[in-house]
Amino acid sequence: MTTTPTKKLNESNFGFIHYSSALSHYMDQDFNIAMEVFGILENKYFFGNWGIVESDSIQMNNEAVKNENGGDILGAYILSTGKKIWIKTVGYGIKENQMDLKEYTKEDYNNTCIMFPEDY
Protein backbone atom coordinates (compact mmCIF):
# COMPACT_ATOMS: atom_id res chain seq x y z
CA MET A 1 0.00 0.00 0.00
CA THR A 2 1.32 3.45 -0.87
CA THR A 3 0.43 6.99 -0.03
CA THR A 4 0.19 9.94 -2.37
CA PRO A 5 2.87 12.58 -1.90
CA THR A 6 1.47 15.94 -0.92
CA LYS A 7 3.94 18.53 0.34
CA LYS A 8 7.57 18.10 1.22
CA LEU A 9 8.15 17.33 4.89
CA ASN A 10 10.68 19.22 7.01
CA GLU A 11 13.99 17.63 6.00
CA SER A 12 15.71 18.70 9.22
CA ASN A 13 13.40 16.31 11.12
CA PHE A 14 15.03 13.36 9.34
CA GLY A 15 18.38 14.09 10.98
CA PHE A 16 21.69 12.69 9.78
CA ILE A 17 21.26 10.47 6.70
CA HIS A 18 23.48 7.44 6.25
CA TYR A 19 23.57 4.13 4.39
CA SER A 20 24.30 0.60 5.55
CA SER A 21 27.70 -0.62 4.40
CA ALA A 22 26.08 -3.28 2.19
CA LEU A 23 23.89 -0.73 0.40
CA SER A 24 26.80 1.68 0.10
CA HIS A 25 28.87 -1.05 -1.56
CA TYR A 26 25.94 -1.91 -3.87
CA MET A 27 25.57 1.74 -4.91
CA ASP A 28 29.33 2.00 -5.51
CA GLN A 29 28.95 -0.65 -8.21
CA ASP A 30 26.51 1.39 -10.31
CA PHE A 31 26.04 5.16 -10.27
CA ASN A 32 22.47 4.77 -11.60
CA ILE A 33 21.49 2.74 -8.55
CA ALA A 34 22.91 5.43 -6.27
CA MET A 35 20.88 8.05 -8.15
CA GLU A 36 17.76 5.88 -7.90
CA VAL A 37 18.17 5.50 -4.13
CA PHE A 38 18.73 9.24 -3.72
CA GLY A 39 15.67 9.90 -5.93
CA ILE A 40 13.49 7.66 -3.75
CA LEU A 41 14.64 9.52 -0.65
CA GLU A 42 14.19 12.97 -2.17
CA ASN A 43 11.04 12.45 -4.24
CA LYS A 44 9.09 9.87 -2.25
CA TYR A 45 10.22 9.51 1.36
CA PHE A 46 10.62 13.25 1.99
CA PHE A 47 7.08 13.72 0.65
CA GLY A 48 5.46 11.10 2.88
CA ASN A 49 5.20 8.37 0.25
CA TRP A 50 6.19 5.38 2.38
CA GLY A 51 6.28 2.91 -0.50
CA ILE A 52 5.17 -0.67 0.04
CA VAL A 53 4.78 -0.79 3.81
CA GLU A 54 1.70 -2.23 5.51
CA SER A 55 -1.24 0.02 6.40
CA ASP A 56 -0.41 -0.05 10.14
CA SER A 57 3.09 1.25 9.36
CA ILE A 58 1.63 3.98 7.17
CA GLN A 59 -0.62 5.02 10.03
CA MET A 60 2.30 5.10 12.51
CA ASN A 61 4.46 7.01 10.00
CA ASN A 62 1.77 9.61 9.39
CA GLU A 63 1.19 9.99 13.12
CA ALA A 64 4.93 10.57 13.71
CA VAL A 65 5.01 13.20 10.96
CA LYS A 66 1.88 14.90 12.25
CA ASN A 67 3.07 15.08 15.86
CA GLU A 68 6.80 15.69 15.21
CA ASN A 69 7.50 14.14 18.60
CA GLY A 70 10.37 11.80 17.96
CA GLY A 71 8.48 8.93 16.38
CA ASP A 72 10.00 6.35 14.07
CA ILE A 73 9.23 6.15 10.35
CA LEU A 74 9.74 3.25 7.93
CA GLY A 75 9.53 3.27 4.14
CA ALA A 76 10.07 0.28 1.85
CA TYR A 77 10.77 0.44 -1.88
CA ILE A 78 11.77 -1.88 -4.73
CA LEU A 79 14.70 -0.72 -6.87
CA SER A 80 14.69 -1.21 -10.64
CA THR A 81 17.10 -4.12 -10.05
CA GLY A 82 14.44 -5.90 -7.98
CA LYS A 83 16.28 -5.34 -4.69
CA LYS A 84 14.22 -4.06 -1.78
CA ILE A 85 15.43 -1.19 0.38
CA TRP A 86 14.19 0.22 3.64
CA ILE A 87 14.48 3.81 4.76
CA LYS A 88 14.13 4.12 8.53
CA THR A 89 14.08 7.35 10.50
CA VAL A 90 14.51 7.21 14.27
CA GLY A 91 13.34 10.21 16.28
CA TYR A 92 11.52 12.16 13.57
CA GLY A 93 11.00 15.69 14.83
CA ILE A 94 12.41 15.14 18.32
CA LYS A 95 13.29 18.44 19.93
CA GLU A 96 16.68 19.13 21.46
CA ASN A 97 15.15 19.75 24.89
CA GLN A 98 13.85 16.15 24.79
CA MET A 99 17.37 14.76 24.34
CA ASP A 100 19.86 13.71 26.99
CA LEU A 101 22.92 15.23 25.33
CA LYS A 102 25.16 14.41 28.29
CA GLU A 103 25.24 10.76 27.24
CA TYR A 104 24.18 10.85 23.60
CA THR A 105 24.53 13.02 20.50
CA LYS A 106 21.78 14.49 18.36
CA GLU A 107 22.63 11.85 15.75
CA ASP A 108 21.82 9.11 18.29
CA TYR A 109 18.32 10.50 18.65
CA ASN A 110 17.56 11.67 15.16
CA ASN A 111 18.87 9.88 12.09
CA THR A 112 17.78 8.17 8.91
CA CYS A 113 19.36 4.98 7.61
CA ILE A 114 18.88 3.58 4.11
CA MET A 115 19.53 -0.16 4.02
CA PHE A 116 18.60 -3.56 2.72
CA PRO A 117 16.06 -5.29 5.01
CA GLU A 118 18.65 -7.93 5.90
CA ASP A 119 20.95 -5.16 7.23
CA TYR A 120 18.49 -4.29 10.00
Give each language-model segment a name.
Residues M1-I73:
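Compact soluble domain cores
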Residues A64, N69-Y120:
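Short, compact, well-ordered microdomains
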